[in-house]
């Protein structure tokens, strides 16, 4: 990308690439879970997680959507938060700043590790007609693993921040750090373990 067409507000790293929120580089971020490589998009040098719904026009296209934008969109899931993209983006930005301070790592890498760690690999589904219904354990597709991981992370952060002195940004940062470590203090990890335990009993 030619330097002349990049606005002066956008800062570049040493290699001339754009940084997320003008602070966090995309370079060196990798998905360690081989099954999720095609479903966690690190980003293609966009300073803000906003593509104006470009990835919702076709089914399954959201798999190519930048993972930070998907996290931002998940924060808007409750009815009263619908459409507040600017607020959600600000929450994610502050959460990333907190993660960078607490871990001394790139927050993008921490988020990718958290999503890979708290997506359930096995779930249970209902099988049978109205008369006899039983539950059967099934494998979870990689896209659904990412979807559920993002939903669980944001639900955990929202519940932790409710009636709490801590802000939603602090709770989101804490949730992402705990999920990346695989800690049982994370709401997402606890829910994932619960789903997998129920699925195991229904094999």
Swiss-Prot record:
Single biological process term from Gene Ontology: translation
Compartments reported by the entry: Cytoplasm
Lineage of producing organism: Eukaryota, Fungi, Dikarya, Ascomycota, Taphrinomycotina
Lineage: superkingdom: Eukaryota
Keywords: Cytoplasm, Ribonucleoprotein, Ribosomal protein
SUPFAM superfamilies: Ribosomal protein S7
Name by which UniProt lists this protein: Small ribosomal subunit protein uS7B
Family: Belongs to the universal ribosomal protein uS7 family.
Species the sequence originates in: Schizosaccharomyces pombe (strain 972 / ATCC 24843) (Fission yeast)
Subunit structure, interactors included: Component of the small ribosomal subunit (SSU). Mature yeast ribosomes consist of a small (40S) and a large (60S) subunit. The 40S small subunit contains 1 molecule of ribosomal RNA (18S rRNA) and at least 33 different proteins. The large 60S subunit contains 3 rRNA molecules (25S, 5.8S and 5S rRNA) and at least 46 different proteins.
Keyword Ribonucleoprotein applies: yes
Gene: rps502
Molecular functions per Gene Ontology: mRNA binding; rRNA binding; structural constituent of ribosome
